[in-house]
Amino acid sequence: MGLYKQFLTKISGNAFVQRLLAAQARDMNHAMGIGTSGDFSNDGEFIVFDLIRKSCQPPYCIFDVGSNKGQFLAYALNDMKQTDYDIHCFEPSQETFRMLTSNSPSNNRVTLNNLGLGKESCEAVLHYSEDGDEGASLTKRDLRHYGINTNHSETVRLTTLDEYCLTHHIEHIHLLKLDIEGHELDALSGAKKMIIGNQIDIILFEFGGCNIDTRRFFRDFWHFFENTPMDLFRATPSGYLIKMEKYKEEHEQFCYSNFVALRKI
């Protein structure tokens, strides 16, 4: 044990120092992009638009999977207003889709789809606490510790990204954004042909507490991308991308974080 660790061990045997250490750990994690997801302006997500402009040529094709009420769409429209683009939005909940439609400007370059993306085309049950719930999930989550009851549900339609692209004659996606509360890996599985075919440049997805309920670990994402022509990174608030060189158990951090997969050049 090094001298610094010995010093910490000696002074840490009380509640006050433990609280200081916990606060320090949270600050350090935040700087590394762990637990930062949720505030678009401060969680590293914005970096994807810089990446698109630097590495891709317009017209840009963007998939917003898990559109909710149009929060990400609003950022994308503002960022892309000086260029050519096509944005495809996916929101399976009927009431939330109505909110999305109401919040979205009339724009023939934006396609709103009242369905979700998954590993197969089917019907599924969506669970949520209230209309427009940002945490709506295809898994009934146990959120009693937050005083939240996901006691509402509805049957929704799902398709796969590969099937959607085939039907709509989409040959390339510049940005695939996934925020579907623990079912991101299912959507990735349904996009395997496009990913393996080098037809997706950038994938942005969230990992966090919802993965506790779906029992999907970071290890599962690591092994998925290990067999694809993409490199995996964690986004930080500064915009710096930390490359996930190899899997470590310490990566299993269930406070919400954003990850970016980039097509290998």
Predicted regions and their residues:
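Phosphate/nucleotide-binding beta-alpha loop and adjacent structural elements of enzyme active sites
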Residues: 1-265
